[in-house]
């Protein structure tokens, strides 16, 4: 083997070693990259696991806060609706109260009504002697019907005619524009036993209050049933 052949053989060996080294280096590089990617993925997953509970906790806090805010807004809306309903009902009651003044303004019909109220009050009290209180403007009307009211009561209750004393202290006058929300009486009577232990308020205002309270569920149903549906 001459020098040329030896030189060729050495070059072939060098190429082989270099190729093998490059392949080995490439394998190492690929393996290192795969290992790096695996470690990177593991680190990412580990961080996700750390972050997830905190994220879930904050997400729950946000959901709870949203529910609370929604509930508060819903309650506020309901309160506004109820307030509007109450305002409407109260305005109807105020209009009805204004109508009472027309009742007492018609003396012909009001006089008959006063008699009925006195008889009804006597039947409730069933006392031999009572004290009657009315508005100052109604005294003459009450005195005009008093005897017939006593006789009607005595006939219905099958008792002697009672003694009725018209009190010198009067019920408040009817409401005016200046004292619309002050103490007032739209008409009617208040009867009490002599000792004052039994009192029956049979004023127009008291009867309106009782009737309105009794009919309130029906009024609300008729006014707001469609809105509720």
UniProtKB/Swiss-Prot annotation:
One Pfam assignment = vATP-synt_E
Sorted alphabetically, the Gene Ontology cellular component annotations on this record are: proton-transporting two-sector ATPase complex, catalytic domain
Name the domain of life this protein comes from.
Eukaryota
Question: Which terms does the record give in the GO molecular function aspect?
Answer: proton-transporting ATPase activity, rotational mechanism
Give the InterPro entries listed for this entry: ATPase_E_C, ATPase_V1_Esu
The UniProt keywords, alphabetically, are: Hydrogen ion transport, Ion transport, Transport
Similarity-based family: Belongs to the V-ATPase E subunit family.
What function does this protein fulfil? Subunit of the peripheral V1 complex of vacuolar ATPase essential for assembly or catalytic function. V-ATPase is responsible for acidifying a variety of intracellular compartments in eukaryotic cells.
Query: Quaternary structure per UniProt?
Result: V-ATPase is a heteromultimeric enzyme composed of a peripheral catalytic V1 complex (components A to H) attached to an integral membrane V0 proton pore complex (components: a, c, c', c'' and d).
Q: Under what name is this protein listed?
A: V-type proton ATPase subunit E
């Amino acid at each position: 083997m001459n020098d040329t052949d030896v030189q060729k053989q050495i070059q072939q060996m060098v190429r082989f070693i270099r190729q093998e080294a490059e392949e080995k280096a490439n394998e190492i590089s690929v393996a290192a990259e795969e290992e790096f990617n695996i470690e990177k993925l593991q680190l990412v997953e580990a961080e996700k696991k750390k972050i997830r509970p905190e994220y879930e906790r904050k997400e729950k806090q946000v959901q709870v806060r949203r529910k609370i805010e929604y509930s508060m807004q819903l309650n506020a809306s309901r309160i506004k609706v109820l307030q509007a309903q109450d305002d409407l009902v109260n305005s109807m009651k105020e209009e009805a109260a204004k109508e009472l003044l027309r009742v007492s303004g018609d003396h012909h019909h009001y006089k008959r009504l006063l008699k009925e109220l006195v008889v009804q009050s006597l039947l409730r009290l069933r006392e031999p002697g009572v004290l009657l209180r009315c508005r100052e403007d109604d005294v003459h009307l009450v005195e005009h019907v008093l005897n017939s009211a006593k006789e009607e009561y005595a006939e219905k209750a099958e008792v002697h005619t009672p003694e009725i004393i018209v009190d010198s202290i009067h019920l408040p006058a009817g409401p005016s524009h200046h004292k619309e929300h002050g103490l007032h009486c739209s008409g009617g009577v208040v009867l009490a036993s002599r000792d004052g232990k039994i009192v029956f308020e049979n004023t127009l205002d008291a009867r309106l209050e009782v009737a309105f309270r009794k009919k309130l569920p029906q009024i609300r149903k008729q006014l707001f049933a469609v809105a509720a549906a």
